């Protein structure tokens, strides 16, 4: 009798696996149809709570842009955890650390002056508001961009590279391509940060994900077509355009929680796009909705 039940369970497991594989294949076909004729390279990865993975253009190295602020945050929190540093610890910022020619709500609040701020606030500026100056201050605090790159690799994440700060990425159009990731490497990092206990202080993990949920940028991307109350913790990225009108990247990556509590992780990267900003966001939003519907 026991062998019979084991056989039945195995059969149902196999059937469920086949059904999920078919769903992923159908989803990939729908993405193909959506992208037909689009002047952009699009990469997608989805990792479900059952371990199913969708990979679309996963061989491509996509420039991360501000999505890398998630990587930075993990390294900063790792240092804080190991040194028992509180989120409410105060750091001193020099006016010289706040260059003017970059996106920085923090600089608008403290123009041309020295000031103090808590690490909590600094990380909220970097993640939720995607402040470039806050990000570079945190990179320095964590030990530099190479240290952050090495730390993420130690989490068993490969197929990515970080070598540029925000200031470095602004040095040339080519520099933005040096911070890159495959879509699947991004969702692996998201899942690692969510499911593993990277920090002994649970408050740090809770803070990170709440800050991701509080993200103010890119509401028209992953969240754009999802039901209004869907919980999404995400980090966006966006570049300028070159003289030919090509946009290096429009990105969004994060965690989506379904109404029944199940989760999935998704990265949507749009690279070298001649589509409008609205079209880029619409591509991400429509794919996000396709995934959401397939997961329910």
UniProtKB/Swiss-Prot annotation:
Substrate binds at residues 235-237. It comes from the Bacteria. Residues 1-21 form the signal peptide. Keywords: Antibiotic resistance, Hydrolase, Signal. GO terms for molecular function: beta-lactamase activity. Gene3D superfamilies: DD-peptidase/beta-lactamase superfamily. InterPro entries: Beta-lactam/transpept-like, Beta-lactam_cat, Beta-lactam_class-A, Beta-lactam_class-A_AS. The active site is at 66 (acyl-ester intermediate). It catalyses: a beta-lactam + H2O = a substituted beta-amino acid. It holds the Pfam family Beta-lactamase2. GO terms for biological process: beta-lactam antibiotic catabolic process; response to antibiotic. Its EC number is 3.5.2.6. Disulfide bonds: none annotated. Belongs to the class-A beta-lactamase family. The class A beta-lactamase family has a specific amino-acid numbering system, sometimes called Ambler or ABL numbering and often misspelt as Amber. A multiple sequence alignment was used to derive a consensus sequence and then the consensus was numbered taking into account insertions and deletions. This allows use of identical numbers, e.g. for active site residues, despite differences in protein length. UniProt always uses natural numbering of residues, hence there appear to be differences in numbering between this entry and some papers. PANTHER family: BETA-LACTAMASE, BETA-LACTAMASE-TYPE TRANSPEPTIDASE FOLD CONTAINING PROTEIN. This is Beta-lactamase. The lineage of its organism: Bacteria, Pseudomonadati, Bacteroidota, Bacteroidia, Bacteroidales.
């Amino acid at each position: 009798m026991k062998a019979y039940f084991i056989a039945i369970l195995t059969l149902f497991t196999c059937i469920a696996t086949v059904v999920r594989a078919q769903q992923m294949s159908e989803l990939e076909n729908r993405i193909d149809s959506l992208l037909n004729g689009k002047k952009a390279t699009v990469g997608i990865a989805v990792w479900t709570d059952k371990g199913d993975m969708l990979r679309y253009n996963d061989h491509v190295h996509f420039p991360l842009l501000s999505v890398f602020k998630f990587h930075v945050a993990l390294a900063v929190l790792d240092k804080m955890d190991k040194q028992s540093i509180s989120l409410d610890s105060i750091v001193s910022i020099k006016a010289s650390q706040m260059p003017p020619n970059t996106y920085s709500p923090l600089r608008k609040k403290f123009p041309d002056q020295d000031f103090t701020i808590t690490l909590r606030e600094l990380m909220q500026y970097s993640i939720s508001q995607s402040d470039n100056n806050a990000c570079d201050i945190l990179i320095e605090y964590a030990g530099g961009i190479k240290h952050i790159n090495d730390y993420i690799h130690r989490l068993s994440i490969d197929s990515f590279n970080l070598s540029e700060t925000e200031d470095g990425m602004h040095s040339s159009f080519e520099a933005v391509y040096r911070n890159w990731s495959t879509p699947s490497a991004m969702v692996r990092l998201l899942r690692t940060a969510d499911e593993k206990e990277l920090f002994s202080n649970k408050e740090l993990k809770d803070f990170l994900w709440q800050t991701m949920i509080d993200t103010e940028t890119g509401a028209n991307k992953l969240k754009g077509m999802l039901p209004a109350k869907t919980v999404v913790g995400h980090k966006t990225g966006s570049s300028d355009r070159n003289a030919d009108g090509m946009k290096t990247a429009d990105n969004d990556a994060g965690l989506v929680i379904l109404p029944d509590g199940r989760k999935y992780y998704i990265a949507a990267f749009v690279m070298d796009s001649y589509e409008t900003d609205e079209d880029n966001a619409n591509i991400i939003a429509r794919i996000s909705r396709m995934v959401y519907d397939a997961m329910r």
